[in-house]
A protein has these predicted regions:
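Conserved alpha/beta-domain cores
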Residues: 1-275
Length: 275
């Protein structure tokens, strides 16, 4: 949604009439349809997980003055107060899937809802998505992010609603510690490491005794009510060997990381799985 796409999302967010909002959504659907086609084509027959819009409001609206934008109107919250946003993204994804099928492709799609903290947020959003995918050309799996401490604590309420869940460990670490990553990385964490208060940055290596405990308890409670649920993590921890070892032993099915870290993530995951 940045670059050339930024004016479209701004038009939607600042629309003062349904007509203007609908015009913006039509533009959004057209743009995202092609974006999704470009993603699905090289990943043909492989699962592609699309996380619905999650960025904080200030990344789109420079005049937005939220006191704490990372905890403000973003993710599922933005979708719930502007209902048609996630519907539009879902329509674009279905359109892209149809185009791939017409080109003899085999799109395998998963849709993930971000920043859930309340069961009702997920229930409402999934209902909207299911209404949009009723005529989808193939099956679409639905999932949720677990990136707030409350979501981890009520994972057994969320797990029956979805096919998969993914821990967003960057945000989960921020909210568990009460750290603003952008603010404390240099000013606090480096000093804490020098003072031996911290051994490693919790944003570089997963905090097993705190954040990790939330992850482990959420996995256990989720599998108790939905044994077949697929569980993974996304974030910088997905490329850290120590974090990967902990996560594999905690029961995750996969880790997601930035491209340069994929080789080490694969190696460590395989080694740990064979033990």
């Amino acid at each position: 949604f940045l670059g050339e796409r930024l004016p479209v999302i701004r038009k939607f967010l600042t629309a003062e009439s349904h007509e203007t909002q609908n015009d913006a959504l039509k533009e959004l659907i057209a743009i995202q349809t092609q974006d999704f086609v470009n993603v699905l084509e090289p990943m043909d027959s492989k699962p592609v997980t699309i996380r619905l819009l999650d960025a904080p409001l200030h990344e789109f609206l420079e005049d937005s003055h939220e006191q704490n934008p990372m905890l403000g109107l973003r993710g599922v919250r933005l979708a719930l107060v502007t209902e048609n946003l996630y519907r539009a993204q879902t329509r674009a994804l279905i359109s892209a899937a149809q185009k791939r099928l017409e080109a003899s492709g085999n799109p395998v799609i998963e849709i993930m809802v971000p920043l859930v903290s309340i069961k009702g947020e997920l229930e409402t959003t999934l209902r909207w998505i299911r209404e949009e995918i009723m005529e989808a050309p193939n099956d679409i799996r639905l999932g949720t992010m677990i990136e707030t401490p409350r979501a981890a604590l009520i994972a057994e309420e969320l797990a029956p609603l979805v096919d998969f869940m993914s821990f967003g460990t960057n945000d989960l670490t921020q909210m568990t510690y009460g750290f603003s990553r952008d603010d404390v990385e240099a000013s606090v964490i480096k000093q804490y490491i020098k003072m031996d208060i911290l051994q490693e940055s919790p944003f570089a290596q997963l905090d097993a005794s705190g954040v990790g405990k939330l992850v482990q308890e959420a996995i256990n409670s989720s599998r108790a009510v939905n044994p077949k649920i697929k569980i993974g993590i996304c974030g910088e921890h997905g490329g850290d060997p120590t974090s990967i070892r902990f996560l594999v032993n905690s029961g995750v099915n996969y880790v997601s990381c930035s491209p340069p870290r994929i080789p080490i993530a694969r190696l460590v995951s395989a080694q740990e799985s064979l033990k």
